[in-house]
Amino acid sequence: MIWRPVLTIVLSACWLLPVRVQAQRTQAPAVESPVVNADRTVTFRLKAPNASKVEVTTQFTKGNQPLTADSEGIWSGTLGPAEPNLYPYNFIVDGVAVADPGNPDIFPNERFKSSLVEIPGDQPAIYAVKDVPHGELTRCYYASKTLKRTRPLVIYTPPGYRAGTERLPVLYLVSGTTDTEETWTKVGRVNFTLDNLIAEKRAVPMIIVMPYGNMMMGTPPPTSIQAADMYKVFNEELVTDILPFVESNFRVLADREKRAIAGFSRGGGQSLFT
């Protein structure tokens, strides 16, 4: 099953917007967090009036950083400056790690709960949303005979794919340990990166298939014997289930010279074993 009518979903949501806005007018204003300042420092805020201790941890600081509460129970602190990049972070409230409720940009992951903050540079990053033609992301579900369950895929198609007829090369891009099929787009921004590379003639138009790399719950370390077994299961599912689904529903070139596979962490190991 393929979810194509993204625009329809968005338009349907718009019908509900006036009602939701009306209801929100009676609510207290949200706490703005994070705020990226001009000097590339970041101000984090969290409303937690009943908490006794709140910290924040980021990848541009070392260790947990304490926040200070005001009279209304809003904890805040400013960290950095940080080098331009996209960083995960989370709050630790009385010892419990939580994502930032004021930030819709979430790091998709099975274990840790983190939000994302982008520190812009003087020049747009390769993953920035630029004024170029953009491709589409399609969320799909397929029946896995190998695992005997329904499994997700995220598939990128390049600009002009919907109106075209040409078959295209395909890259199978596998998620890392504890990551999901959404991590490559929501964190890696691979769709915007390829949009920009295609526009700059630095990459050919291609389709990217992003499967959920976890073949079993409780993923073992990549060095264990169980991990090698999991790599074999991934190879079987790729050949038996994923490739036939993709080749039946998308205009991909099915010969080995036009197929590639890559991955991060666990996904890198799965790619090498395929």
Task: Give the ranges of each region predicted by the language model.
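N-terminal secretory signal peptides that target proteins for export/translocation
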Residues: 1-3
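Generic alpha-helix initiation/capping and coil-helix boundary signal
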Residues: 5-6, 176
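Bacterial N-terminal signal peptides
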Residues: 6-18
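Boundary at the C-terminal end of the N-terminal hydrophobic targeting segment
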Residues: 21-25
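Non-catalytic cap/lid and distal C-terminal segments of serine-dependent acyl enzymes
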Residues: 30, 36-55, 59-64, 69-274
